[in-house]
Amino acid sequence: MKIGIVGATGYGGTELVRILSHHPHAEECILYSSSGEGNVYSEGYPHLTGLADQQLKPIDMNTIKHEIDIMFLAAPPGVSSELTPKLADAGITVIDLSGDLRIKEPAEYEKWYKRTAAPKAVIQEAVYGLAELNQLQIQQAKLIANPGCFPTAVLLGLAPLAQKKLLDESFVIVDAKTGVSGAGRKASMGTHFSELNDNFKIYKVNEHQHTPEIEQALNEWQPGLGPITFSAHLVPMTRGIMATMYTRLTCDLTADDLHDLYSEFYQDSYFVRVRPKGQYPQTKEVYGSNFCDIAVTLDERTNRVTIVSVIDNLMKGAAGQAVQNFNLMNGWNEETGLTITPIYP
């Protein structure tokens, strides 16, 4: 299969190139860029020397429509809104890693992203690519809205409770931490070494754009769920997300009941690993992989549930899940090209 990637020079795009360089069904991978066209890709990314030595090509729809079968869009918000309708008209399958197609209500997207939404018909056609929870729709889709990094960790952590209608409608708190690669490759004051090193900070307080994405999915599973409290923090590490979630339940369950519920829910999900009781995951334990590791426990003193979910933000939170969706869309084993052991230590 001939594959295109727009945004191959960003961190998410680079991970796509790395994964697809050894994917058995990737016949050819064509890399497109709005800048740097003509440059040899591996010269800018020496770790891919011998694996991705092709030249970057300009984004030209007249050429693209004759070159590829599927396009991964790993560009910033706004690019997909412009390109996706053209790609769809050309009969090209699209997997979009930006947030442009995730929020079903255009007004809600514009409120949180502060930009014009994609055409509503395109948004409505897009299937939300949370692979473990939406397999049947993904298998039939031609357009995928790949979930955000925080929503992936949070929704996988809360899905077993939400799908059983067990979440307290007014009490869901998410405290999430991410590595700096989630901010992208472009330099900024907030990601400058001297600003980030030996530091730990909260950002986008009460206005993070992943909030409505999380709420949208939760309300599909458990209608009537109220607004959540979501806080994001930046920590001085390169990769990884840890989402810690606190909630109350609508019925009485023991710690053993909860662990059994999660274990059964994900028993057929290769990439979600529910930890043994009393063992809590660390970001290092999923580094470089497509795994999501989850722990769940009950505080009997407060009767509150704590769920801990960790992912690699560039893999399960972006490129890895995109390739997982690529596999599902084509009827292949979802693990194809993704059986990458976490890098440790």
UniProtKB/Swiss-Prot annotation:
One of its GO terms (molecular function) is N-acetyl-gamma-glutamyl-phosphate reductase activity. It holds the Pfam family Semialdhyde_dh. Gene3D superfamilies: Dihydrodipicolinate Reductase, domain 2, NAD(P)-binding Rossmann-like Domain. The active site is at C149. Pathway: Amino-acid biosynthesis; L-arginine biosynthesis; N(2)-acetyl-L-ornithine from L-glutamate: step 3/4. GO terms for cellular component: cytoplasm. It catalyses: N-acetyl-L-glutamate 5-semialdehyde + phosphate + NADP(+) = N-acetyl-L-glutamyl 5-phosphate + NADPH + H(+). It is found in: Cytoplasm. PROSITE patterns: ARGC. It comes from the Bacteria. Disulfide bonds: none annotated. Catalyzes the NADPH-dependent reduction of N-acetyl-5-glutamyl phosphate to yield N-acetyl-L-glutamate 5-semialdehyde. Belongs to the NAGSA dehydrogenase family. Type 1 subfamily. NCBIfam families: argC. This is N-acetyl-gamma-glutamyl-phosphate reductase. It comes from Bacillus subtilis (strain 168).
